[in-house]
Swiss-Prot record:
Lineage: Bacteria, Bacillati, Bacillota, Bacilli, Bacillales
One Pfam family cited in the UniProt record for this chain: Ribosomal_L17
Protein name per its UniProtKB record: Large ribosomal subunit protein bL17
Recorded name of the encoding gene: rplQ
Keyword Ribosomal protein included in the entry's annotation: yes
Gene Ontology molecular function terms on file: structural constituent of ribosome
Species for this entry: Staphylococcus saprophyticus subsp. saprophyticus (strain ATCC 15305 / DSM 20229 / NCIMB 8711 / NCTC 7292 / S-41)
Listed NCBIfam families: L17
GO BP term, pick one: translation
Amino acid sequence: MGYRKLGRTSDQRKAMLRDLATSLIVSERVETTEARAKELRSVVEKLITLGKKGDLASRRQAAKTLRNVEILNEDETVQTALQKLFGEVAERYTERQGGYTRILKVGPRRGDGAESVIIELV
C-alpha cells in the first residue's frame, strides 16, 4: 500500500499529519487540500478504531500520534484531545464499522489553485 509524499520529508509529513489529526479530533472539521485530507483520513480512522477499543495499549498507541492539546469545554472543564478521542468520539461511533470521516469539496484555493476540501467527522 502506498502513501502520498505531500512534498515533504518523512518526519515533516508525520508532524503535519499529527497536527491535522489533533485539529480534526478537537474541532471535528478542518479545511485543507484534497491530498492532505485523503492521507489524514487513514490516520484518523485508525485513531478512532483505537479509541473504540479503549484499552491501555490502544490509549498509549493513540498518544504517540495525537498532540497534547487541552480543550476548554462549555462547562469550564479542561479536557485533552486524547480524552476527547477515547470518551466523546469513541462513544459516538460504537455501532459504526469504519467510515468515520467525510470529505466535502470546496473548490480551488485562491492563492495557488490547489483543490480545497473540508474533512469532518460524520
